[in-house]
């Protein structure tokens, strides 16, 4: 389709040297922060686009940055020793600075904002870089001296030194990541608000709403903690106003429309105080940015939840506000009757002191989290408001926040639209139970037939309609009485192989999860193969996919209408996700795991029975797994993928393409996300000749022959497999060029556009796919 989208308000490019490990880690942290991957609970907000650039030549990055894709292009340059020593990068940075200055001097063109980051002292040697974001500090913790080599190394001492080094490196990394994300967020708020980067930026005022009876001390602690770490200026009562000022209007205005937002310290007494409720109401009462127009917005607000011992209730206007818990004070205090000479009493004093210090540190961490999250809410509010002001309402209500009963009722009372045809909220589609709750609220307030959906779904339909001439957008997997299609998803890749495409493995994982949500909510099943990683680890791709299956499957076991609740037996027998695991990784899946995900994920183990050599058995198991997966699934989607260092006989995505072709199944091949999939697409669209990176000789250069070429997987065996792959790919190439192939190459490099093409292609391939069966 290659449908050109209108420019976004902002796009972020993180530039770093491919040899710089710390800069690469910082780039990943930028992606996680602005794509909201730190959110464990919702995961529905879309975030901001973040891309990488690690290569340059002749003063230009590769790939080149698309300045036309956003009104404001923020170029974050992670400057360290490797970049400072690279002549190509120095030349490129000079040209980028010149272009950024020209863009700011030319009204009406896309703006380029250059933000250098001081990762180490090398930036001080580059005179072309000024006003850097300083995340490096000489006071940061450093590794302890290595144990002396003059005497035989003690294993225990060496081990303790290595553990301590890792701990300090991790702590230093977290410290610098936090500095970077806060400074970047503050800088981008100034950019969105048009503040001159050379001028002294005004401090953003933040109102702290709290109950004086049990929240004043915590509110003061938060206020005092702000000064050391941010450019926010907090205030919360008449003591922060000049003498003689009536506090009513400033405090109401503070809750409703201060430049920086509001923090609600929700203690046990907070819901019982009329003034607190009034402040919450003011902050969360929607208002139109443009009178008689749109969008509807609310004050950026976060909540600090202080759990006490009193029964209490919630506050309705704060139902959809992001919140974090305040650290509890569970100190082991010594008995007041203990004698100071008593050793046990002294020990208790020490423990109490240590716990008090730890509590103080946890409070500091919480305050930092509150500052960072509020800054992010302010930035997202500014970005979203700019984005939707270009949209045509056309009978819609467009919201800049996730709605709840309070906000929807207020919009209705203000007479925005007696009966809108549609209500749009920001971000990705809500989880199925949340969406059903929202559907019920909207029906009760605005009447039956008013559709409520995410802006992502709206954008997907708009892209599909513009690109495919489809007048109805993207349908769900369709008509009753037919089968439900299982879609095989195959992706992956290593950072170093994906960086040339301007992305990393985190982008691939993000696309995998977003695509999974869309497919599940549109009545498709999904399947994926490979290792499940460690199921007991809280953060990994597998758990993200299973979370998507639980939250976004269309046949949720949660339904507000009892007569529509699905048969629980069918839910167990037809789980939305299927995982194919090849030997020996399938041995990691225990009965406990299978029971834990019963009705959600079916685990298929694949183990060749007639093979004795373990190395050959591993390779054969992967081939057999991919063959079975191709046979069981109706279509396969390929993107990313390892080029070198894969497991099995052949590159994983290449073998998956071959097995799906052999099974006569259609394949959607995404070329815009790098990796093996991009090489395969390049080959099929080109003039012939397999890419060198997919040859046996090139793979051998990236391997330890002693590990890769073993008795069960000998050189002759592997060369034979490669020759077979080449012959098969040549056959696919011929079919692709004579128009008989079932390979569909999708060239979109933008996630939303790629998903739109995928969904539109699936609806054409399977126009009568529907729930029930496979």
What does each of the following model-derived ranges do?
Residues 1-77, 192-193, 201, 205-211, ...:
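Hydrophobic, helix-prone linear segments
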Residues 19-20, 55-57, 64-124, 212-213, ...:
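Conserved beta-strand-loop-alpha-helix hinge of the TIR/SEFIR fold
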Residues 98, 224-228, 253-254, 281-289, ...:
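Short, surface-exposed basic-aromatic patches at helix termini and helix-loop junctions that form
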Residues 117, 208, 234, 262-263, ...:
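Residue-level detector of buried hydrophobic side-chain packing
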Residues 29, 92-96, 179, 183, ...:
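Alpha-helical scaffold elements adjacent to nucleotide-binding pockets in ATP/GTP-utilizing enzyme cores
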Residues 1-36, 105, 109, 118-223, ...:
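C-terminal interaction surface of TIR/SEFIR-family domains
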């Amino acid at each position: 389709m290659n449908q050109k989208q209108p420019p976004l308000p902002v796009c972020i490019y993180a530039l770093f040297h491919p040899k710089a490990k710390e800069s690469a880690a910082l780039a990943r942290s930028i992606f996680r922060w602005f794509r909201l991957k730190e959110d464990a609970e919702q995961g529905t907000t879309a975030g901001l686009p973040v891309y990488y650039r690690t290569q340059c030549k002749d003063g230009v990055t590769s790939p080149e940055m698309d300045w036309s894709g956003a009104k404001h292009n923020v170029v974050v340059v992670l400057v360290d020793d490797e970049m400072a020593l690279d002549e190509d990068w120095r030349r490129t940075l000079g040209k980028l600075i010149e272009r950024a200055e020209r863009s700011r001097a030319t009204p009406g063109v896309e703006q380029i904002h250059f933000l250098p980051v001081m990762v180490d002292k090398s930036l001080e040697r580059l005179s072309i870089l000024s006003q850097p974001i300083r995340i490096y500090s000489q006071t940061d913790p450093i590794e302890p001296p290595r144990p002396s080599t003059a005497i035989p190394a003690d294993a225990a001492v060496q081990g303790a030194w290595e553990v301590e080094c890792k701990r300090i490196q991790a702590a230093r990394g977290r410290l610098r990541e936090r500095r970077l994300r806060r400074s970047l967020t503050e800088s981008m708020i100034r950019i969105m608000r048009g503040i001159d980067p050379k001028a002294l930026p005004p401090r953003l005022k933040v109102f702290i709403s709290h109950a004086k009876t049990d929240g004043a001390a915590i509110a003061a602690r938060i206020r005092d903690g702000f000064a050391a770490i941010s450019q926010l200026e907090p205030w919360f009562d008449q003591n922060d106003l000049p003498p003689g000022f009536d506090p009513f209007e400033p405090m109401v205005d503070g809750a409703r429309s201060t430049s920086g937002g509001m923090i609600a310290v929700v203690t046990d007494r907070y819901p019982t105080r009329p003034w607190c409720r009034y402040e919450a109401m003011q902050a969360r009462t929607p208002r139109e940015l443009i009178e008689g127009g749109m969008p509807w917005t609310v004050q950026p607000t976060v909540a600090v939840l202080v759990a006490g011992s009193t029964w209490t209730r919630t506050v309705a206007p704060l139902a959809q506000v992001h919140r974090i818990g305040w650290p509890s004070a569970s100190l082991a205090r010594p008995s007041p009757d203990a004698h100071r000479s008593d050793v046990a009493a002294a020990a208790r004093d020490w423990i109490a002191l240590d716990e008090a210090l730890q509590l103080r540190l946890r409070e500091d961490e919480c305050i930092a989290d509150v500052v960072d999250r509020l800054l992010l809410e302010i930035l997202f509010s500014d970005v979203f408001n700019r984005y939707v002001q270009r949209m045509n309402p056309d009978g819609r209500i467009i919201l800049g926040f996730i709605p709840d009963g309070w906000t929807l009722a207020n919009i209705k009372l203000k007479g925005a639209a007696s009966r809108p045809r549609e209500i749009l909220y920001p971000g990705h589609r809500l989880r199925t139970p949340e969406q059903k709750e929202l559907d019920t609220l909207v029906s009760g307030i605005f009447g039956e037939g008013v559709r409520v959906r995410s802006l992502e779904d709206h954008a997907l339909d708009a892209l599909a309609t513009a690109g495919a001439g489809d007048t109805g957008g993207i349908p769900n997997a369709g008509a009753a009485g037919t089968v439900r299609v299982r879609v095989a998803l195959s992706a992956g890749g290593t950072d170093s192989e994906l960086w040339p495409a301007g992305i990393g493995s985190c982008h691939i994982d993000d696309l995998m999860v977003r695509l999974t949500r869309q497919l599940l909510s549109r009545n498709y099943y999904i399947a994926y193969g490979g290792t499940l990683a460690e199921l007991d680890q809280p953060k990994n791709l597998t758990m993200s996919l299973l979370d998507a299956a639980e939250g976004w499957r269309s046949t949720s076991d949660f339904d507000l209408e009892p007569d529509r609740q699905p048969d629980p037996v069918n839910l167990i027998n037809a789980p939305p996700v299927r995982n194919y695991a090849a030997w020996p990784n399938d041995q990691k899946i225990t009965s406990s795991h299978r029971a834990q995900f019963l009705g959600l994920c079916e685990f298929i183990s694949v183990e060749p029975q007639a093979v004795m050599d373990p190395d050959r058995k591993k390779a054969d198991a992967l081939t057999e797994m991919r063959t079975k997966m191709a046979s069981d699934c109706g279509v396969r989607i390929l993107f990313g993928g390892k080029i070198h260092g894969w497991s099995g006989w052949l590159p994983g995505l290449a073998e998956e393409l071959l097995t799906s072709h052999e099974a006569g199944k259609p394949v959607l091949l995404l070329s815009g996300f790098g990796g093996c999939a991009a090489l395969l697409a390049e080959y099929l669209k080109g003039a012939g000749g397999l890419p060198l990176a997919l040859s046996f000789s090139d793979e051998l250069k990236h391997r330890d022959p002693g590990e890769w070429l073993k008795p069960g997987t000998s050189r002759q065996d592997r060369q034979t497999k490669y020759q077979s792959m080449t012959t098969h790919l040549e056959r696919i190439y011929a079919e692709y060029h004579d128009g008989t192939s079932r390979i569909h190459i999708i060239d979109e490099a933008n996630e939303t556009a790629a998903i739109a093409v995928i969904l539109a292609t699936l609806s054409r391939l399977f126009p009568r796919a529907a729930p029930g069966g496979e």
